[in-house]
């Protein structure tokens, strides 16, 4: 099962990307809203396919890959262990990223964050609008498939924007703790926005769950 902790997600799932021994299989998390709840910004067909097909595939493939990895460990087959690393990273990252993504969205979302998160955004980016522009640009600018992220640099105590290719998990790739992720794989928007990724980015700001992002930020500051 994916840890429900909002801080240190990469560390919580780290065992899934290279361990062994007994474990529970990963499972597809339920959405905290109906498939059609984010309309008109993200339609129900996209949400259903994205969650029940794409995310489910990452979960299933992660479980299969981990079983193979355990077998390779038991046999002492280092070559097989190395060969399985890309699949662990891809499917484990897909599971981590999407589990964050669903909670980052809400039919009651949009607007601006409040309190300490808003103050931190103003401190590190100048204003909320400048932050939106920078994260939008980073997300639109991803070549091919990937993610745009707002992350927290715990060592510096600062918010940072980053982009990761494919399903590379933010924390495992950059060390930043994920607060807000924007999926820019085509399966996240193509059925509604076709090849116009900027329109999808413009729409998704209307359903950002700032309460969830703030919760993640406050947890990581402790």
From Swiss-Prot:
Modified sites of kind N6-acetyllysine: 68, 75, 114, 122, 130, 202
UniProt KW keywords: Acetylation, Manganese, Metal-binding, Mitochondrion, Nitration, Oxidoreductase, Transit peptide, Ubl conjugation
Entry's EC annotation: 1.15.1.1
Reaction(s) catalysed (UniProt annotation): 2 superoxide + 2 H(+) = H2O2 + O2
Domain of life according to the entry: Eukaryota
GO molecular function, one term: superoxide dismutase activity
Statement: the UniProt record of this protein carries the keyword Acetylation: yes
Chain positions found as 3'-nitrotyrosine: 58
Positions bearing N6-succinyllysine: 68, 75, 122, 130
Assigned GO CC terms: mitochondrial matrix
Transit peptide region: 1-24
Cofactors required: Mn(2+)
CC cofactor note: Binds 1 Mn(2+) ion per subunit.
Major localization listed first in the record, in broad terms: mitochondrion
Biological process, per Gene Ontology: cellular response to oxidative stress; regulation of transcription by RNA polymerase II; superoxide metabolic process
Compartment(s) where it occurs, according to its Swiss-Prot or TrEMBL record: Mitochondrion matrix
The record's account of how the chain is modified after translation: Nitrated under oxidative stress. Nitration coupled with oxidation inhibits the catalytic activity. Acetylation at Lys-122 decreases enzymatic activity. Deacetylated by SIRT3 upon exposure to ionizing radiations or after long fasting.
InterPro entries: Fe/Mn_Superoxide_Dismutase (IPR050265), Mn/Fe_SOD (IPR001189), Mn/Fe_SOD_BS (IPR019833), Mn/Fe_SOD_C (IPR019832), Mn/Fe_SOD_N (IPR019831), Mn/Fe_SOD_N_sf (IPR036324), SOD_C_sf (IPR036314)
One Pfam family named in its UniProt record: Sod_Fe_C
Binding site for Mn(2+): 50, 98, 183, 187
Role: Destroys superoxide anion radicals which are normally produced within the cells and which are toxic to biological systems.
Record text on subunit structure and interactions: Homotetramer.
Protein family (similarity comment): Belongs to the iron/manganese superoxide dismutase family.
Protein name: Superoxide dismutase [Mn], mitochondrial
Organism encoding this protein: Macaca fascicularis (Crab-eating macaque)
Encoding gene per record: SOD2
